[in-house]
């Protein structure tokens, strides 16, 4: 037998251009972060991390299937502040010196845009600092 799906005007097809009449929301991970943190690019597109200690972004989870994915990593300092960020080698920055300076004031908010270029290569844009 053959299964036939009834026509539904609200069905989205991956191989056709689609027009959305409502906002489309990317999945966002919101979490407290300290120590080694692994970002899951298969599940989430955006990340909101409240630093409760110094953070190292570890090798990310399975980004090979996410080539072309873009999003943001939002860093929020907790009420103490002075938290730092370091990166695994899969994360590449505009300068060889790493992610650059992030805000360290208590409750500061920074945004880092990213793009998955290929497996094991996530390009980070310049840090946009001190929102608020």
Report residues per predicted region.
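Acidic, glycine/polar-enriched metal-coordinating patches/loops
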Residues: 1-7, 50-132
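Flexible, charged surface loops at secondary-structure boundaries
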Residues: 13-14, 39-43, 64-66
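Alpha-helical interaction segments
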Residues: 9-11, 37, 104
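Extracellular beta-solenoid/beta-roll
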Residues: 21-44
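Fibrous stalk/shaft segments of extracellular and virion attachment machinery
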Residues: 1-26
């Amino acid at each position: 037998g053959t299964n036939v799906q009834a026509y539904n005007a609200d069905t989205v097809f991956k191989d056709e251009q689609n027009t959305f009449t409502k906002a489309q929301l990317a999945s966002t991970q919101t979490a407290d972060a300290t120590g080694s943190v692994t970002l899951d690019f298969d599940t989430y597109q955006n990340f909101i991390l409240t630093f409760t200690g110094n953070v190292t972004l570890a090798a990310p989870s399975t980004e090979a299937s996410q080539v072309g994915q873009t999003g943001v990593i939002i860093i929020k300092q907790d009420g103490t502040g002075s938290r730092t960020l370091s990166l695994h080698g899969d994360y590449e920055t505009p300068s060889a010196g790493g992610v650059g300076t992030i805000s360290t004031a208590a409750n500061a908010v920074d945004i880092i845009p990213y793009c998955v270029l290929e497996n094991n290569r996530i390009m980070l844009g310049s840090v946009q600092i001190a929102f608020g």
